[in-house]
């Protein structure tokens, strides 16, 4: 089974929570859902390192401390996606740092639920649950 790893970086408190999402580039993806910044493992075997690398490559944001939100399996493609969450660095604004994405921005949680790939919405729920338990 193919797999990828990415991050769900956030800022704000539970009432004003925003998460960092990216939109894939290209005419074929014009109406595609948004995603967490993610990618497939390269030479590294550590999935958290893959998530960090892909986030930096796609958004220009270097992730700080991360916790695992587990994984999901896409219903159609059966691809496994591992997600790591952490607070976004306060002084960093995302940018499209890769040809793979045409937008990278923080979006409010409610909006993220409408933009995000439906299978990835479970990561939003897991993030909220984690933050409620802090």
Where are these regions (language model features)?
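N-terminal strand-loop-strand
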Residues: 1-36
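Active-site-adjacent beta-strand/loop module that shapes the phosphate/pyrophosphate-binding cleft
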Residues: 2, 72-98, 103-105, 127
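Short, charged/polar surface micro-motifs in flexible loops or helix N-caps
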Residues: 13-16, 27-29, 42-43, 77, ...
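Residue-level detector of conserved, well-ordered beta-strand and adjacent loop positions
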Residues: 22-23, 37, 70, 85
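Structured beta->alpha junctions
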Residues: 26, 40, 72-73, 116
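The catalytic Nudix box helix
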Residues: 36-69
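Charged phosphate-binding loop/patch that engages nucleotide di/tri-phosphates or the phosphate backbone
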Residues: 116-134
């Amino acid at each position: 089974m193919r797999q990828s790893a990415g991050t769900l970086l956030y800022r704000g408190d539970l009432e004003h929570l925003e998460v960092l999402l990216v939109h894939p580039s290209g005419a074929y993806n014009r109406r595609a859902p948004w995603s967490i910044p993610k990618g497939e493992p390269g030479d590294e075997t550590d999935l958290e390192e893959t998530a960090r690398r892909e986030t930096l490559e796609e958004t220009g944001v270097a992730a700080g401390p991360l916790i695992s939100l587990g994984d999901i399996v896409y219903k159609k493609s059966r691809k496994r996606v591992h997600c790591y969450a952490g607070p976004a660095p306060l002084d960093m604004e995302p940018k499209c740092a890769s040809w793979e994405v045409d937008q990278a921005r923080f979006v409010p949680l409610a909006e993220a639920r409408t933009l995000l790939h439906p299978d990835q919405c479970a990561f939003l729920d897991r993030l909220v649950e984690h933050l409620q338990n802090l």
